[in-house]
Design a protein with these regions (language model features):
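N-terminal glycine-/serine-/threonine-rich phosphate-binding loop
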Residues: 1-47
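Active-site-proximal beta-strand elements of phosphoester/diester hydrolases
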Residues: 11-23, 105, 117-119, 138, ...
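Active-site beta-strand/loop signature of hydrolases that rely on acidic residues for catalysis
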Residues: 29, 40-67, 90-91, 153, ...
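CN hydrolase (nitrilase-like) catalytic-core segments centered on the catalytic cysteine
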Residues: 71-89, 155-251
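Short beta-strand scaffold segments in enzyme catalytic cores
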Residues: 92-94, 104-108, 137, 233-235, ...
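Short, glycine-anchored, charge-dense loop/turn motifs used at functional sites
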Residues: 106-115, 236-243
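A short, polar/charged loop-to-alpha-helix boundary motif
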Residues: 120-133, 249-261
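Active-site glycine-rich loop that binds ribose-phosphate moieties when present
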Residues: 124-137, 152-158
């Protein structure tokens, strides 16, 4: 990745995207991802991190198997190519169709190529239609080694431990925790946001301190056709302290500098 302009201090500048990801609209979501990559480029970032299932939107494979996509799908490959055009790497989410199975997957692309994937190793409620990933991936990114934790994986130790044991120096937590019941006013949005702040951000803080690693979060935000998501983009330091974050549940992006020494 020579020529990508990593920071002189050895750190990595990252854009964390808490965006709305429409269900069943890979092309529309692709356009939004490309816009975010351009925003990241203009902000001097080397990496953009997107939420769980960001490209496909959340998918229930038992009900809508047609919304899951293979890794060679045009939208997956086009987004990988866009990382070369923007000179910004990307970690993005999809519901992956793999032969007769489905996985919840984060794909890492850089320099115009799909480099590798992390499949979800610990499933949450209502995810029985998915297969469990068995491998732990770590992606080299300049001076950083990136591990990935996907939503419900944050609530257990073994996924974090496996990524740390594989050499991850920075852990990226990508989530799409659908809220039970629609959000219809500010009070209901705030209630869902507070739950995820306590649960999701709380897990990020606990594991950051336990493992002595930086943790960066990107969560789906806003309303889709039949489900709402609580947002939160944040950076947590190795002591478990939140050093940067978006203020509430609304969609947005957050640029952070992560030390790697």
């Amino acid at each position: 990745m020579a020529g990508w302009g990593f920071r002189d201090d050895g750190g990595v500048r990252v854009l964390l995207a808490s965006i709305t990801c429409a269900k069943g609209d890979a092309e529309g979501n692709l356009a939004r991802h490309v816009e975010v990559l351009d925003e990241a480029r203009r902000a001097g970032c080397e990496l953009a991190v997107f939420p769980e299932m960001s490209l496909t939107g959340s998918v229930e494979p038992d009900r809508h198997p047609e919304r899951a996509v293979p890794l060679d799908h045009a939208a997956v490959q086009r987004l990988a190519e866009a990382t070369g055009e923007a000179e910004v790497a990307a970690l993005y989410g999809l519901a992956e169709a793999a032969d007769d199975r489905f996985f919840i997957t984060q794909a890492y692309a850089a320099g115009g190529q799909l480099v590798g994937v992390q499949r979800k190793r610990h499933l949450g409620e209502d995810e029985e239609g998915y297969a469990v990933g068995t491998d732990t991936a770590v992606f080299g990114h300049g001076p950083a080694r990136l591990g990935v934790v996907i939503c419900a994986e944050a609530g257990v130790d073994h996924t974090w431990d496996a990524s740390a044991a594989a050499g991850a120096s920075v852990l990226l937590m990508c989530s799409a925790p659908g809220l039970y019941g629609r959000r219809t006013d500010e009070a209901s949005w705030r209630s869902g946001f507070t739950w995820w702040e306590d649960c999701g951000l709380g897990d990020a803080r606990r594991h950051a301190a336990r493992l002595g690693r930086w943790v960066a979060m990107a969560t789906q935000a806003g309303s889709t056709a039949d489900e709402d998501f609580p947002g939160i983009a944040a950076l947590v330091d190795p002591a478990g302290e939140v050093v940067a974050r978006l203020p509430d549940w609304r969609p947005g992006t957050l640029v952070v500098d992560i030390p790697t020494d």
